[in-house]
Amino acid sequence: MIKTLQNTLKQDKEHLTVPKSVQDTIPIRRIWPDGLFQFGGKFSKTIRFSDINYAIASKEDKTSMFLGYSELLNALDTGSTTKITINNKRLNRRNFEREILIPPQGDHLDGGRSEYNAMLLDKVTDSSNSMVQERYVTVSTHKKTPEEARTFFDRVMNDVTTRLNHLDSHCEELDAVERLRVLHDFYRVGEESRFHIDLRECMKTGRSFKDTICPDSMEFWKDHFIMGDKYGRAMFLKEYASYIKDSMINELTSLNRTMMLSIDVIPVPTDEAVREMQNRLLGVETNVTNWQRRQNSNNNFSAVVPYDLEQQRKETREMLDDLTTRDQRMMFAVVTLVHLADSKEELDSDTETLQSIARKHLCQLTTLNWQQDAGLVTALPIGLRRIDALRTLTTEALAVLMPFKAQEIRDRGGIYYGQNVISKNLIIADRKQLLNGNGFVLGVSGSGKSFTAKREITALALSTQDDILIIDPESEYRPLVEGLGGQVVEISATSSNHINAMDMEQGYGEGENPVVLKSEFLLSLCEQSVGAGKLSAKEKSIIDRCTAQCYHDYVRDGCRGQAPTLQDFHAELLRQPEAEARDVALALELFTEGSLNTFAKPTNVDMSSRIACYDIRKLGKQLLSMGMLVILDSFLNRITRNRRLGRNTWIYIDEIYLLFQHEYSANFLFTLWKRVRKYGACCTGLTQNVDDLLQSHTARTMLANSEFLVMLNQASTDRLELARLLNISDNQLSYITNVDFGRGLIKCGSAIVPFMDNFPRHTQLYKLMTTKPSDLAA
């Protein structure tokens, strides 16, 4: 026998003791606050790691992930046993309600909060997504003292964490309380919210930690066990197919039941493995030679070597070749699974379902007869292995038992963005946690762009006190904004509402000279009036000079009093000696003294409402781009003020592509996009004209650098452009190809997740958000 395996089996051997209490069925002997557990002469520690997007990755990405996972398995320490566990656990309803639901605040929006909370609860009580999956790596080793064990784990856990991080999986080492919580939630299903343990208090009172986590009763029978009021069954993978698909583990754990599936791995040093395979090959060759000698003695010189001997020789040579030339390692592994149910009938039905999944992959999943207690502790992420049905595998064969499925987005304190198409879990994201919270919502007309933005606006209005500012070129947001108690400001050439394009808040420009940024803005404004690319260098210098002169007194007085207007700027241009100044003044005259002078007068709009929508539908083509620019600049003033007050600001710009049609307006937007992040604000651009958007280099840069993107149904040319720009695989592209309303991909940080959102249509909130004519008619 291989020496490493012999030593491991010897170290794992335990004295047989009959448990006299429920606590005795939990084999942990000692625990330390840092998460170190001891059982027998072994110590263990556990890492929790997040899922990655394996199921929908492209073939190349899957290969890369597979090789990365193989490297992790190859790097496992030969002096230890590693357990990879997938834990299907019920969603903790109380924690969910505390983290996700919006508490009433005693104002006019409580009705909306009640509807919104009911929608969320409906989605999580649906059986398909009432489970959450957690993944753990538990490493156990035989050491003489806890100090030796800690030194070993510091090295090994750091290596495992680094390799998981390379796969884009986030890791955290579990302390004693977290490890006990995992066991408590399994032993006492349905009582997750009651878990509480104070290790210091336990030490003071002499109370065992097992009292907190153990079930009320345990009964072990031949082929099942009863734990409290739950029925359970421990099983193991007995027969392996010659070829296993990498989706088998995911299919087994997709059953909507409380379940633990563990893969125990004992790595073998390569020199021992090679020596073992050489000895086996020598044995096979000896058998072949002896057989041929017997045939020769019978004068049968043309006999063919029997198939079974030939097969043994071929397989042994392949295994030896894997070990010596293909960078494979020999490993011993056992797959155990424990699942729970509410009744014996349900348990038997679930067992049959699991066995049929295994049979589909030509494997045999068998019940552990008279070993239910051993199977239970082997499947749990304690680090113990009491099932000796070990199977010899290479790295490649073991890596096929892939624990990854689909990435989840669940940020603490985030808001609802839909459901993960693959796992059916809620997508809860907090854009403020991203490096850059700015984003885009992209999709063809009718795909649900406006609805997506409105759903986010609704969630923010109901759950925060943040300011929400909207540029609305199509008069789509009025019902929602008014329903949320916000203010709709209609801006047009004939409207009595005016916004001064030259308003400037104290602190405008991030502590730098505010006139520099304002000069950039006025250059953008003048470019809108004279035409894209038609401003000469002389004209730019004159505009910059006049801007400084207009603001001289206002800035000197600390931005107090009456801000200058475009009419003042126009007058300043006329005072300049250059002929070019008069040309610029003439081009601006329509917007300062003429019929389109709505932005050339002092602001008379009440800007106090925290939810404000600027309806610019009636601005007309001449004023539309300029109007969007002026409103954006007024938003920058609002953000500057909110920064002083410590308040977050959310900006929504519908039909954002209009701003990229002129160089200076695109540059001003780019500057705003970069600045607002530091000011505690997030910008969101919406457009169906992705092709137009990508014509601008500035827009491409902004899109590529945005940490948050919602991609709904896309036109074919737009899909290809987005795939190139964002490195989206063909599999992922299928989620934005000819899909229904409210379906697509959401990019949040490094995660790209397919989502769907079926918002209940009977609610008052839906009626405020929808723009479908059929819904409005109803």
Cite the ranges covered by each PLM segment.
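Conserved lysine of the Walker
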Residues: 449
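Post-Walker A helix-loop "phosphate-sensing" segment adjacent to the P-loop in P-loop NTPases
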Residues: 459-469, 637
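Extended, folded cores of ATP/NTP-driven motor/assembly subunits in large transport
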Residues: 1-406
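A short helix-turn-beta junction within AAA+ P-loop NTPase domains corresponding to the substrate/partner-engaging
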Residues: 485-489, 698-711
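P-loop NTPase motor domains
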Residues: 52, 59-78, 89, 253, ...
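Hydrophobic positions on the alpha1 helix immediately C-terminal to the Walker A/P-loop
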Residues: 452
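Hydrophobic anchor at the beta1->P-loop junction of P-loop NTPases
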Residues: 441
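Conserved P-loop NTPase
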Residues: 726-778
